[in-house]
């Protein structure tokens, strides 16, 4: 990155339309393809080495300099001479270049904000570790939780208009709009088969992206979520807790921060609705992937108001059609909230904590809520069935995709899945469901080996013996755990206790 810093500083000197020249710079595509222009898509095209890849980029830049080739006919865009026979390759290269150039102002803004706040740069900002202290410390004291599915905008034009409020570069966004329309005509980026989140199993998210160009569209999607979250948090902090104060939602982003300084009742012309809700100092907001969690200690009446407020905010500000089922409010003690990509559920159960002030005094029992991790067998089995490790009924089957690998690699891949599950669900008190999943993986591994060697499952069971069985069901005892030791004989039964999420801290380091 240091070798390109000089070029970036020169291009940043033009504050007006400073992004547009970056699209014609070779080093932008070098940054996109890991400094070598030989990764991602270019690797899949046989016969292209580093030099020829650089020639492809130069040829693409030369075509972009010829402005007449960038004009697309409104009647028939398929005859556009700009792309030629290599339209898929050129479009993929250009999408990576656009992704890098658009991300530059936001990355520079993040670095400057970290420097002003004297915060050390962290590469683990998207870590899941911050979720677990939230559930451990805050979640048991809340009454209601709302599991929210963040909808996706109806059209990509909405994302471009949102970006224009942050970056004043008309030329770049005209080219970006032209590029997206060309992509939509080919149907090569947006396909009805791949979702934006591979872990999401909700059918309410209409956003689908192809595997070949995820970086650019994931940036647009994450920016839309960030924009929605910023408006939501701003309205939450500025709402009134006294009486039923009403105000208009600041849907448009033009002069948004000027309106923050002089906060008054502002009504949008297209959406003159008035929202009524309270400022809740006890509400907690956690966003992960395409979903978010709203947890509060308020009454169900206020939670319903927040629910309809979110739906109205999506429909008016983000121009997304969100159904009422997208935000479901439930009592935290009665229902579990599924979160993250590991299909983990948590439930708040009552627990008795015994305490003793003096050695021979009475033992006091305090009732408090504790968090139990549940291993959901049905979602995990569905995930394994999607990965072709078992059928829909949970019966193990062979995985033919891995049959071409060596025996060591096949066994190691299945064992790695078991280690991941053990590390994640190690704190669960009931591990019967985990053992069932491991049993499915073990038989799937053996059937894959038998398929590779054209033999029977019984033969491989005799050949491998009990060693493979022990490896699949061995607990990860070497993982770090926090143990509380007490010398008092009265509390002998409470000597050991595991804080389960610390195991994941160690596993992901």
From Swiss-Prot:
The subcellular localization recorded is: Plastid, Chloroplast
Q: Which GO terms describe its cellular component?
A: chloroplast
Instruction: Set out the biological process GO terms recorded for this chain's protein.
Output: mRNA processing; RNA splicing; tRNA processing
Q: Which InterPro entries match?
A: Domain_X (IPR024937), Maturase_MatK (IPR002866), Maturase_MatK_N (IPR024942)
UniProt keyword list: Chloroplast, mRNA processing, Plastid, RNA-binding, tRNA processing
What the entry lists under Pfam families is as follows: Intron_maturas2, MatK_N
Give the superkingdom in one word.
Answer: Eukaryota
Report the protein's function.
Usually encoded in the trnK tRNA gene intron. Probably assists in splicing its own and other chloroplast group II introns.
Q: Which PANTHER family match?
A: MATURASE K
The entry's family comment says:
Belongs to the intron maturase 2 family. MatK subfamily.
Question: Could you tell me what this protein is called?
Answer: Maturase K
Which gene name belongs to this protein? matK
